[in-house]
A protein has these predicted regions:
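Nucleic-acid-binding surface
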Residues: 1-129
Length: 129
């Protein structure tokens, strides 16, 4: 139901060295996030058909398997929410992503088109790659 996203997903993927002050999760539209917000989570909502895209399982430091959005989805989510995040965090994460051997630029551009951030993402990538 809830998927770790945004700054929290960056931390899971080692794309930032900032441990999130608040864990960030994404739920599908229609889900009542008030309990999660009361528990201290920052909650984003997304349409049901976009919610499942890019979910992978990752291990916490305690060995628990949790749902997290993949790196490519996380980058697109950050751009979609750019009014709510520090752009420096995004730029640093994108620089780290560009250095990774396991990056998938084809998938990143596919997601960027699906999430309508392609025109915003492209200039950043042209500088980095």
């Amino acid at each position: 139901q809830a998927v770790f996203s945004h700054e929290t997903a960056l931390f899971f993927h080692d794309l930032t060295d900032r441990e999130p002050l608040k864990y960030t999760i994404t739920v599908r539209t229609g889900y009542n996030p008030s309990r999660l917000q009361e528990d201290g989570f920052q909650v984003y909502t997304v349409k049901k058909d976009l919610h499942e895209i890019g979910i992978i399982a990752m291990q916490t430091s305690f060995g628990h398997s949790v749902p997290v959005y993949d790196m490519e989805r996380t980058i697109c989510d950050l751009l979609r929410s750019r009014k709510n995040i520090e752009m420096q965090v995004f730029q640093d994460a994108l620089k780290q992503y560009a250095k990774r051997k396991d990056k998938n630029l084809r998938m990143l551009m596919k997601y960027a088109a699906m999430f309508h951030v392609e025109k915003i993402l492209r200039p950043y990538l042209e500088v980095l790659l």
